[in-house]
Design a protein with these regions (language model features):
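Rossmann-like dinucleotide-binding cores of NAD(P)H-dependent redox enzymes
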Residues: 67, 75-133
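Glycine-rich Rossmann-fold phosphate-binding loop(s) that bind the pyrophosphate
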Residues: 50-51, 71-76
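A conserved short coil-to-beta-strand element within the FAD-binding core of flavoproteins
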Residues: 1-8, 126-139
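Short low-complexity, flexible loop/linker segments enriched in glycine and/or proline
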Residues: 63, 107-110, 140-142
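A short helix-to-beta-strand connector/capping loop
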Residues: 6, 42-44, 89, 119-123, ...
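FAD-binding core/adjacent interface of flavoenzyme oxidoreductases
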Residues: 1-67, 143-150, 155-160, 164-166, ...
C-alpha cells in the first residue's frame, strides 16, 4: 500500500508494517502499446502478443484479413510476419531503425534477413515510426507514420518492445 523510503518500511492493505534493508520491486514488464487506447485493441483491429489468449485472437484475425501491418521488426514481429506470409497475406513491417532485430543480432545478419524476407514477399518501411491511425466502418485503417505516409491495413500487430509494469506506482 505504502512505501516509506526514509524509514525503510512498507505497509500492505491491512496496514501491516514491514521493514527492509534493501527493497527490490520486480513487477515485470508489459507490451509497449504505443499509446493506443486499449479500447482499440478490444475492437479487434490492433493486436499485441503477450500470452496464449493473444495468440488465439491473432490467429483468428489473420485468417479473416488480407493486409497486415506489423509495427516492430523484432523476433515477435518477424515470426508473425512469416506465419502471415505462409498464409498468403500481404505483410508490411514498420521499423523505426534501419535494421531488423537490432538489439539481438549484428548489422550484417540483419541485412541478410532483410534481403531474405524481402525476397519472400514481406515489405519493409525503415526509419519511420507509428504516429496515429484513422479507421473506417469497414475496419480498414490508415496507419499514419512519422513522416505522414499513410498505409492501409485491415490488421495491425504492435510488437514494439516492452516497458516497465509500473501499475504499482500509479
Amino acid at each position: 500500500k505504502f512505501i516509506n523510503h526514509k524509514n525503510k518500511s512498507l505497509s500492505d492493505e491491512k496496514d501491516n508494517l514491514y521493514y527492509y534493508d534493501k527493497l527490490v520491486i520486480a513487477t515485470g514488464s508489459k507490451n509497449n502499446l504505443l499509446g493506443i487506447d486499449t479500447k482499440e485493441y478490444q475492437k479487434g483491429n490492433f493486436f499485441s502478443l503477450r500470452n496464449l489468449e493473444d495468440s488465439k485472437r491473432i490467429r483468428k484475425k489473420i485468417s479473416e484479413v488480407q493486409t497486415i501491418t506489423i509495427i516492430g521488426a523484432g523476433f515477435i514481429g518477424l515470426e508473425i510476419a512469416t506465419t502471415a506470409l505462409q498464409l498468403n497475406k500481404d505483410v508490411t513491417i514498420i521499423e523505426n531503425s534501419e535494421n531488423v532485430m537490432g538489439r539481438s543480432i549484428s548489422k550484417d545478419l540483419s541485412k541478410w534477413l532483410i534481403n531474405y524476407y524481402t525476397k519472400s514477399g514481406i515489405k519493409f518501411i525503415f526509419n519511420k515510426s507509428f504516429k496515429s491511425f484513422k479507421s473506417d466502418e469497414n475496419s480498414i485503417m490508415n496507419i499514419i507514420l512519422s513522416d505522414d505516409t499513410k498505409i492501409n491495413s485491415e490488421m495491425v500487430l504492435i510488437s514494439a518492445g516492452s516497458q516497465p509494469n509500473d501499475l504499482l506506482f500509479e
